[in-house]
Design a protein with these regions (language model features):
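Hydrophobic alpha-helical membrane-embedded or membrane-associated segments
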Residues: 11-14, 71
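Bacterial N-terminal signal peptides that target proteins for export
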Residues: 1-9
Length: 121
């Protein structure tokens, strides 16, 4: 019985589990998809900057300004996520890509805000 499980059922389960992941595309974006990722990242950065500038006179804490801007601009990255998932890319990979774009733009915004606040004093 042990040999039947090891040599019959285990390979079948392995093939089934591999087929579950085979339906997703790889990370090889088409030119249009790559351009959409680049544009969405730029739009997100622009949105963060515009939102932060509108809040800079009302708040004196850079972290609060950055948090508000990130919440206000989250829809840009959500649309990118939805598009790539609907284009049949793995949701985990898309989540990492979108998270990386978000982190990069947010860290840059926070750095710029802190620099601006220091110059303002």
């Amino acid at each position: 019985m042990k040999y039947i499980i090891n040599y019959v059922f285990t390979p079948i389960f392995l093939l089934i589990s591999l087929n579950a992941y085979a339906e997703y595309k790889t990370t090889d974006f088409s030119k249009e998809e790559y351009q959409m990722v680049v544009n969405a990242s730029g739009d997100y950065t622009d949105c963060l900057n515009e939102s932060a500038m509108s809040q800079i006179e009302q708040q004196n804490d850079a972290r609060v300004i950055a948090d508000h801007a990130m919440k206000e601009c989250a829809t840009v990255l959500e649309e990118l996520y939805d598009y790539l998932v609907s284009a049949n890319y793995a949701p985990e990979a898309v989540r990492r890509l979108v998270g990386r774009s978000s982190n990069k733009a947010s860290n840059k915004l926070l750095s710029n805000l802190m620099r601006f606040m220091a110059m303002k004093k």
